[in-house]
Every structure is written in structure tokens, then in C-alpha cells.
């Protein structure tokens, strides 16, 4: 379609930056006096992070350190979905942190409706775990991007705008 401009709305994070943040967290935990003997372990997979410690207080401290390191590495805290701390073997405490990636269909519908209500000249389309917004005017698309940046606090996942053409 000649004259059509578009961009994609995705929710993703840099896996390597997360690996670096977890590594820095482990290093700081091993050198901090209050956490040195807390037996802290962090296990990272593609979809989740498991934090284990001797006490709930140590678990909270590790979580704070992790959030600080993630922010320094330009990772949004919205990617972390903290589960309830549960008891692990040996009197330890475990917390599973699910890593949010992609936009689920319910949220995609909500975002598409927000865009449609405010900007009738653009067409948002759901494509798997992303959203493509097309329109004739680049100015309209820029306005949609600015609108989404303003409303980012209402959206539970971090958004990135990619493939702007």
C-alpha cells in the first residue's frame, strides 16, 4: 500500500542485560556483610528467575539489589512478576519471579481500543504478541507513540515501538 506508514508495539527486554544484572546482583550479595551468610542463590532461565535465601528479609534485600541493578542496565521493573515467597527445603525461602515478555491478547485488545478511541485515522492490528499500527500520516503515528508514552503507567508491561516506517 503506497503512502502507508506503520510501527510495531512490542514488549521485550534484552536478555543479556538481564543476565548481567543478575550476575552483578550475585556479586554484590556475596560481598555485602548482611547478606554474605544468607545462602543466596539466583537461578535464571528464559522465562523465570528463582531467588532463594535463608530468610524473607534477605530475600527482600536481594530483590532490592536486583531491581537497582536492573534499572542501572536500563531494564524496566515491569518485566518482573513476583510470585509469593514460599518455603523451600531446610528452612529456606524461595521466590519465583516470572519474566514478562510479549503482549497477551487481552492487553493487546485494550491497547488497540485506546488507540482507536483517540486516533480514528490509524488502524491497530494484533499480530501474535505484538501490535502493528498503520496510518497514512507519520504525524498521526508520532502522536500515537507520544500518547502511549503518556499512558505507560496504566499498562502493566514495558512497551517498545519498533519498525517505524
From Swiss-Prot:
Plastid listed as a keyword: no
Record key words, sorted: Nucleotide-binding
Superkingdom, taxonomy of origin: Bacteria
Cited InterPro entries: DUF520, UPF0234-like_C, UPF0234_N, YajQ-like_sf
Listed Gene3D superfamilies: 3.30.70.860, YajQ-like, domain 2
GO CC annotations on file: cytosol
GO MF, one example: nucleotide binding
Keyword Nucleus: no
CDD domains linked: YajQ_like
Function field: Nucleotide-binding protein.
Family listed: Belongs to the YajQ family.
Protein name: Nucleotide-binding protein Cagg_1607
